[in-house]
Regions:
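General structural concept
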Residues: 1-16
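Signature of short aromatic-glycine-proline-rich micro-motifs recurring in repeat-based ectodomains
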Residues: 44, 194-196, 240-244
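Conserved strand-to-loop turn within each blade of WD40 beta-propeller repeats
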Residues: 4-7, 59-63, 103-107, 151-154, ...
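Long, well-ordered mid-to-C-terminal structural blocks that present hydrophobic/aromatic surfaces
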Residues: 193-221
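Terminal intrinsically disordered, low-complexity extensions flanking WD-repeat/beta-propeller proteins
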Residues: 225-242, 249-252, 258-264, 268-342
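Per-blade loop-tip surfaces of WD-repeat and WD-like beta-propellers in eukaryotic adaptors/scaffolds
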Residues: 12-41, 52-54, 65-100, 106-135, ...
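Loop/turn segments within WD40 beta-propeller blades
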Residues: 48-54, 90-98, 139-146, 198-204, ...
Length: 342
């Protein structure tokens, strides 16, 4: 597992539980430390493995760079430099015909870096305009390798086809076109900054979160607001918020940082299943490991916690006559709210 810190350091962890104990500590295999000549100068905002080969990974930082790393040597293979602070980047998990890295920066344009041509071409001239403020989150569709979603501080979420000169396919509208274009909130996704987005595993829907404390689910083919109500989803992050969805569960879940906890919702009903408690400072990011049905969360308390599914939950202490755990149907293939986990 890759992790990036606010100090610019990148650490690689071995996730194997060699102890076979229920509670264990993952070992750090190696790191790009403060003394490394190519270490990021400021906070690392995003790290990602090259989707087809773990021999390479990428990182981006507030130091205005995107770096491509050789995993074996921990040396940079390429560096892309930007004029603005970098908030987020993403490589397509399904692309076979391009090696584009989408980058969101403090500028209002979506920027694309081509790993095939390298930094000699710097940043592609195809920079899509359309947003009015900084781009806080970017994500490629897992369904179509040319479709890119972007979220901005201008309250808008856009879907792009990077093959098209005009670029923009859809600007989603929280009102589904039912309000006049003269209304200030027309063609906006949220009533505040949109600082996180995530496609569902099949790519048919897109989830977004905003500083209006709302999460919304969109049809990714036509941009329709599905109007699923998740209630208040606390979000006071000043930068990108990285949340994730489950893969391979009988019901699909979304995991969202919520203060010092992680809120778990069923995607299509909006029901809040549980709150995962274990961190003691704000959670900034979480990622799902589908092979083992595990969730990992990173927090400002300097800890990364691993969460595993639990099919049973403890019986309340006030019932002294009952000693057995009871199966909670809501947690079949799902998640336990036990404070002991993590």
């Amino acid at each position: 597992m890759l992790s990036g810190g606010s100090d610019g350091v990148i650490v690689l962890y071995d996730l194997e539980n060699s102890s076979r104990q229920p509670y264990y500590t993952c070992k750090a295999v190696c790191s790009v430390g403060r003394n490394h000549p190519d270490v990021h100068k400021y906070s690392v905002e995003t790290v990602q493995w090259y989707p087809h080969d773990t021999g390479m990974f990428t990182s981006s930082s507030f130091d205005k760079t995107l770096k491509v790393w050789d995993t074996n040597t921990l040396q940079t293979a390429d560096v892309f430099s930007f004029e603005e602070t970098v908030y987020s980047h993403h490589m397509s998990p399904v692309a076979t015909k391009h090696c584009l890295v989408a980058v969101g920066t403090r500028g209002p344009k979506v920027q694309l870096c081509d790993l095939k041509s390298g930094s000699c071409s710097h940043i592609l001239q195809v920079m899509f305009a359309g947003h009015r403020q900084e781009i806080l989150a970017v994500s490629w569709s897992p369904r179509c390798e040319y479709v890119l979603a972007t979220a901005s501080a201008d309250s808008r979420v856009k879907l792009w086809d990077v093959r098209r000169a005009s670029g923009c396919l859809i600007t989603v509208d929280q009102h589904n076109g039912k309000k006049s274009q003269a209304v200030e909130s027309a063609n906006t996704a949220h009533n505040g900054k949109v600082n996180g987005l995530c496609f569902t595993s099949d790519g048919l829907h897109l989830l977004t979160v905003g500083t209006d404390n709302r999460m919304r689910l969109w049809n990714s083919s036509n941009g329709e607001n599905t109007l699923v109500n998740y209630g208040k989803v606390c979000n006071d992050s000043r930068k990108g918020l990285k949340f994730t969805v489950s893969y391979g569960c009988s019901a699909e879940f979304v995991f969202v940082p919520y203060g010092s906890t992680i809120a778990v919702y069923t995607i299509y009903s909006g029901e809040q299943i549980t709150m995962l408690k274990g961190h003691y400072k704000s959670v900034d990011c979480c990622v799902f490991r589908s092979n083992f049905q595990e969730l990992y969360s990173g927090s400002r308390d300097c800890n990364i916690l691993a969460w595993v599914p639990s099919l049973s939950e403890p019986v309340p202490d006030d019932d002294e006559t009952t000693t057995k755990s009871q199966l909670n149907p809501a947690f079949e293939d799902a998640w336990s709210s036990s404070d002991e986990e993590g």
